[in-house]
């Protein structure tokens, strides 16, 4: 069976440690997208990484079938990966979401051009309420009406339950 493909924006600790582990457990091949050259190079050299478990000194989880794409150096490869993805996730910080919207839009346009009929869920795993909806708005800014029609048929933006993703933080009411 061919591995399901995930594209994940943000190769930081949450991306690799939490989301990477979940995707890997669920049988996904993971393309990490980040501008951090050293992390991306490392992922491409080793195609796996280890996560230490907080509760145990010895136990480590190994995450395999990973690769990295540097989106500032190689945006075309990101577009290509999105065109073939079965899931797209982010853990880059709410403020950075608008900066990846155009690249995601181009990936969706490529899916449409290639007549990809399989559904794609795009999930913003960010410390914000309604992160995926927010990302959908930003992505839509770059789409034509016919792109949006394609999006409404095949692309989902389910909101993630944020409290499971990052430790609860106390917010003062503004």
Language-model features, listed with the residues they occupy:
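Substrate/ligand-engaging "lid" and interaction regions
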Residues: 3-7, 13-174
